[in-house]
């Protein structure tokens, strides 16, 4: 098996090394990841300048681009032969609910799926993460399962793991995305010359976090596994929207 590993925390982040080491027992692992932390990069591609790649002493490839750049680069000619699966992570921090819209970790997995491969995004939930090995072992088991049981097209798995020893994990739960309240206000500060600068505020607190959500699974000590679909079309709105549009008169 050939496994492509990427992330958004950067090629030197602890999570990616632990993940790659664990997956190496399944086959050939190639790591292609950003040269620095690119959290929040979402699905952005670098289109206005070339990408530069450096191979590190450990064999990992460091790219001066986004997580999506890394996977796109790896799967469209940089790496031969083609990988069999993409695993993105292990992210230092949650990717729950609305987080998936901004997450570079999830975006890297999405890019793999766009390019035809099964893909998993995996994140640790907590501060000052201590138990990356837990997520790595779970990722390995999921890769084994997906190698024998293919996901439907345009589907990835978004996996969130509590920062606990493996023997304290209460099980795996299939979940839906919860939601957060709106983000906190921006944080205004001043640079040494007295000019205003702005930081994006913290994410909003949980809004929809009841039973069945990814938030709830984590709170109860479970691993959350959310199947995400890349087709964002809202099919149930077709009839209602068509009726609204029929009321619009467009004259030449």
Swiss-Prot record:
Cofactor: a divalent metal cation
Cofactor binding: number and manner: Binds 1 divalent metal cation per subunit.
Keyword hit for Chaperone: no
GO cellular component assignments: cytoplasm
Main location: cytoplasm
Keywords, ordered alphabetically: Cytoplasm, Hydrolase, Metal-binding, Nucleotide-binding
EC number: 3.1.3.5
Catalytic activity line of the entry: a ribonucleoside 5'-phosphate + H2O = a ribonucleoside + phosphate
Molecular function per GO: 3'-nucleotidase activity; 5'-nucleotidase activity; exopolyphosphatase activity; metal ion binding; nucleotide binding
InterPro entries with a match to the protein in the record: SurE, SurE-like_Pase/nucleotidase, SurE-like_sf
SUPFAM superfamilies from the UniProt entry: SurE-like
Residues reported in the UniProt entry to bind a divalent metal cation: 8-9, 39, 91
Subcellular location: Cytoplasm
Xref: NCBIfam families: PRK00346.1-3, PRK00346.1-4, surE
Function: Nucleotidase that shows phosphatase activity on nucleoside 5'-monophosphates.
Cross-referenced PANTHER family: 5'-NUCLEOTIDASE SURE, 5'_3'-NUCLEOTIDASE SURE
Entry's family note: Belongs to the SurE nucleotidase family.
Protein name: 5'-nucleotidase SurE
Organism: Legionella pneumophila (strain Lens)
